[in-house]
């Protein structure tokens, strides 16, 4: 297994797919990285030379990925909660942030149903 940005990427897959195992790199960005590094995206990782892997690593370093990206996202959410914006309040309450209805749905965000005593038979 090759290592790119401290992440083990699978050898048996194509380079463009293997790069998507890194948090913050999707298919489009993976294709762009490989194009900038002059590497064929259909080539399997196991058949890449050490020089090609080095070029890929150098290109991938230019982007915010993994721990830095997670930290940035968490800081953005924390900032929203501190300034008490609508989105920050929704994050704090554990409700959907992007305007979805919550009367019947939103179970993923709200968690399992909490039964209330005395509500039965209404």
Curated annotation (Swiss-Prot):
One of its GO terms (molecular function) is structural constituent of ribosome. Residues 106-122 have a biased composition (Basic residues). Keywords: Ribonucleoprotein, Ribosomal protein, RNA-binding, rRNA-binding, tRNA-binding. Signal peptide: none annotated. SUPFAM superfamilies: S13-like H2TH domain (SSF46946). Pfam families: Ribosomal_S13. Residues 94-122 are annotated as: Disordered. GO terms for biological process: translation. Disulfide bonds: none annotated. One of its GO terms (cellular component) is cytosol. Located at the top of the head of the 30S subunit, it contacts several helices of the 16S rRNA. In the 70S ribosome it contacts the 23S rRNA (bridge B1a) and protein L5 of the 50S subunit (bridge B1b), connecting the 2 subunits; these bridges are implicated in subunit movement. Contacts the tRNAs in the A and P-sites. Belongs to the universal ribosomal protein uS13 family. NCBIfam families: uS13_bact. PANTHER family: 30S RIBOSOMAL PROTEIN S13/40S RIBOSOMAL PROTEIN S18, SMALL RIBOSOMAL SUBUNIT PROTEIN US13M. Part of the 30S ribosomal subunit. Forms a loose heterodimer with protein S19. Forms two bridges to the 50S subunit in the 70S ribosome. This is Small ribosomal subunit protein uS13. The lineage of its organism: Bacteria, Bacillati, Mycoplasmatota, Mycoplasmoidales, Metamycoplasmataceae.
């Amino acid at each position: 297994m090759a290592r790119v940005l401290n992440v083990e990427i699978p050898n048996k897959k194509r380079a463009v797919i293997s790069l998507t195992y890194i948090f913050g790199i999707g298919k489009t960005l993976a294709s762009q990285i490989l194009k900038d590094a002059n590497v064929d995206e259909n080539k399997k990782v196991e058949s890449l030379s050490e020089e090609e892997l080095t070029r890929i690593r150098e290109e991938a370093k230019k982007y915010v990925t993994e721990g830095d990206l997670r930290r940035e996202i968490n800081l953005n959410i924390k900032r929203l909660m501190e300034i008490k914006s609508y989105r920050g309040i929704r994050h704090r309450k554990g409700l959907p942030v992007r305007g979805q209805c919550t009367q019947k749905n939103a179970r993923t965000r709200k968690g399992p149903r909490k039964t209330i005593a005395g509500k039965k038979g209404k």
